[in-house]
């Protein structure tokens, strides 16, 4: 991949997410120390994981999509590596949850989980694709359609899937039930958590199998985008349930609603 495409594909969505946090005043509501800790852990773990597993996924990242690898390596390169990546991707959210002080809200967990997953994915992609920076701004060897498909997978599908999974797990870690509902629907809540865990594991296992399978490029892109849609749908359902059943803020109906821009 050309250097410019690598940079945009790796950093595009993380930068958009940071801009989203800024515009939604998340930096005002969330401790900046926790945000910095989450991002730093994601970068360190992403680079370390990329260096550790570079040989195992070299063909997946260093040659055109669809080239495939030997069938006997599917279990290791197609399942073990993606699942290990998923577990490490969640470490920033787990560490931040352990060090968290103060009240917990599901939306805070979503932000922390998605931020950790996006920084992990971006750092891992940059570390793995760094040798390809030598191709310069233009790559005259790879066909354009192959570059666009790879950019769609590395720059759109993978980070969106990571953000969906990380945000979902973060939401679960920060979810707090009100005292009046602690013992209500306990079986239902546990069943939802089990389903979420199964969906997350299945998504990342399937992503790895898709990467190592000998499939046409457009088919791989379509499968990646399908799994991304499933991850985002699971995030939507999980976040909706968490917001409905978590501890609600005190209501002050008699207070005026102020403009967010001028405070009047």
Residue locations for each model-derived region?
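Hydrophobic alpha-helical segments at protein termini of multi-pass membrane proteins
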Residues: 1-264
């Amino acid at each position: 991949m050309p250097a410019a495409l690598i940079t945009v594909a790796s950093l595009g969505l993380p930068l958009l997410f940071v801009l989203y946090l800024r515009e939604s005043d998340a930096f005002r509501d969330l401790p900046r120390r926790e945000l910095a800790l989450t991002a730093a852990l994601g970068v360190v773990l992403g680079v370390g994981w990329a260096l550790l597993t570079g040989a195992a996924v070299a063909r997946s990242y260093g040659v055109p999509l669809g080239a495939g690898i030997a069938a006997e390596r599917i279990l290791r390169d197609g399942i073990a590596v993606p699942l290990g990546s998923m577990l490490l991707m969640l470490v920033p959210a787990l560490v931040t949850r352990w060090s968290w002080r103060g009240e917990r809200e599901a939306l805070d967990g979503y932000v922390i989980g998605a931020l950790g997953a996006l920084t992990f994915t971006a750092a891992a992609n940059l570390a793995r694709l760094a040798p390809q920076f030598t191709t310069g701004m233009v790559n005259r060897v790879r066909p354009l359609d192959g570059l666009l498909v790879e950019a769609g997978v590395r720059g759109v599908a993978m980070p969106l899937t990571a953000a969906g999974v990380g945000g979902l797990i973060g939401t679960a870690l920060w979810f707090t039930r009100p005292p009046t509902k602690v013992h209500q629907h306990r079986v239902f809540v546990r069943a939802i958590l089990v389903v979420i865990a199964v969906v997350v594991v299945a998504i990342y296992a399937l992503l790895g199998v898709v990467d190592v399978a000998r499939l046409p490029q457009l088919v791989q892109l379509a499968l990646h985008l399908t799994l991304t849609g499933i991850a985002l749908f699971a995030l939507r359902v999980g976040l909706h349930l968490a917001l409905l059943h978590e501890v609600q803020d005190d209501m002050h109906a008699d207070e005026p609603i102020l403009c967010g821009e001028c405070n009047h």
